[in-house]
């Protein structure tokens, strides 16, 4: 199941920022739009799509991952095909809304929820592995899209992406996914099956409304939002921040490689830790890693320290996703995990959408991007303190 979920996660690539970025200049030239107009259309589409995440999550809970992912895959293929027809900024915003809603949002959610249902004791490591495989695969997507654009043009490239989704994500979802282990007479983690005359163990299943009244949900939301806000801002303005210490655009772009390595290491390590007793301290640790990243971003000048900053930023991003994915079902069960994940996803996307603007304003207020990074480090430090004080609201794992 981890392999299938990872594959579907990779197939969301054309709807992720890393995939859309390949089309940016071609959209600008082909539609005669400025970079600002394209960025605004992307922001509007992303923000509007985020508001649907809780509803999508509830529907996933109602119909199951298999059916939901199949529908989302087919709809995603259609929206990608629609991108080949766009004309003008408004139409482009509508297209961005569709691919962000279905690719970055819905399909990504079902791929994560599917793993949550199939693992309990080893859920953290399984989610960390899924994230690692997905990130590795998505990193290839821009290369393939760029080759398609060079060969056929950007409009045909959208159609090619739609075709790939239609012949892969849809059949994988329908024929590969199984909603729950019990549907095959199995149990999470591959444990022994339950005899017919024995009741299935009942795990706590908390509704979305109950979760929203939990302090743990809002602490985890604060960690997720802070990670999304500042992580996105640092990534978006990487050339600006590193340019202040003399790095060229090419040199700054090269630092994405240690960030990718850090994200893989962070996802696997924190996913493994999430299955152990230390997991109730992980939200605070994630916030501390982000604070350390921002302090390094404001002080690093030599190549070793810039390399350390880049790797630490990747660790912050990878660890945040692994901790969020593993703690949600540990806190609230899996009965309503789709709607709860959708609500947390809404918070994360909204924060992410404001990341670039926050650092732009910060550079004006504080005089530079490096200074802004230093001052903004105060917030994750406060979030880390809050998460440490209220760590008792997070479940311990006494088995390891």
Regions found by a protein language model. Give the residues of each.
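Extracytoplasmic
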Residues: 1-35, 53-56, 142, 234-239
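Helix-to-loop junctions at the C-terminal end of transmembrane segments
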Residues: 51-65, 266-278, 364
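Intracellular juxtamembrane helix-capping segments at the cytosolic ends
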Residues: 106-119, 319-332
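Extracytoplasmic gate region of multi-pass secondary transporters
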Residues: 16, 20-24, 209-267
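Structural signature of the two symmetry-related core transmembrane helices
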Residues: 67-81, 281-295
């Amino acid at each position: 199941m981890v392999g299938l979920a990872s594959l579907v996660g990779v197939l969301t690539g054309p709807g992720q920022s890393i995939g859309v970025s390949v089309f940016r200049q071609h959209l600008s030239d082909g539609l005669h739009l400025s970079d600002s107009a394209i960025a605004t259309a992307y922001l509007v589409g992303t923000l509007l799509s985020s508001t649907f995440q809780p509803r999508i999550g509830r529907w996933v809970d109602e119909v199951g991952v298999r059916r939901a992912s199949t529908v989302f895959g087919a709809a995603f293929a259609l929206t990608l095909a629609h991108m080949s027809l766009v004309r003008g900024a408004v139409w482009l915003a509508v297209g961005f809304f569709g691919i962000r809603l279905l690719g970055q949002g819905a399909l990504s959610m079902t791929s994560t929820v599917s793993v949550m249902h199939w693992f309990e004791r080893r859920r953290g490591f399984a989610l960390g592995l899924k994230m690692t495989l997905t990130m590795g695969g998505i990193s290839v997507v821009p290369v393939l899209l760029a080759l398609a654009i060079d060969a056929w043009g950007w409009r045909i490239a959208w159609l090619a992406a739609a075709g790939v989704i239609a012949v892969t994500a849809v059949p994988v979802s329908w024929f590969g996914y199984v909603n729950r282990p019990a549907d095959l007479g199995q149990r999470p983690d591959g444990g022994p099956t339950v005899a017919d005359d024995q009741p299935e163990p009942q795990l706590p299943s908390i509704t979305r409304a109950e979760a929203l009244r939990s302090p743990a949900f809002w602490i985890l939301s604060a960690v997720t939002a802070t990670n999304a806000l500042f992580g996105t801002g640092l990534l978006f303005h990487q050339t600006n921040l590193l340019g202040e210490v003399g790095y060229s655009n090419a040199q700054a772009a090269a630092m994405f490689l240690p960030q990718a390595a850090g994200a893989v290491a962070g996802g696997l390590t924190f996913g493994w830790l999430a299955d152990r007793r230390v997991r109730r301290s992980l939200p605070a640790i994630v916030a501390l890693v982000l604070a350390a990243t921002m302090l390094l971003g404001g002080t690093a000048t030599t190549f070793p320290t810039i390399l350390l900053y880049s790797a630490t930023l990747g660790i912050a991003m990878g660890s945040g996703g692994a901790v969020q994915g593993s703690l949600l079902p540990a806190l609230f069960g899996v009965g309503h995990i789709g709607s709860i994940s959708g609500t947390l996803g809404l918070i994360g996307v909204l924060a992410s959408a404001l990341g670039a603007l926050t650092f732009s304003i910060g550079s004006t207020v504080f005089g530079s991007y490096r200074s802004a990074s230093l001052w903004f480090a105060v917030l994750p430090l406060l979030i880390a303190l809050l998460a440490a004080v209220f760590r008792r609201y997070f479940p311990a794992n006494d088995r390891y």
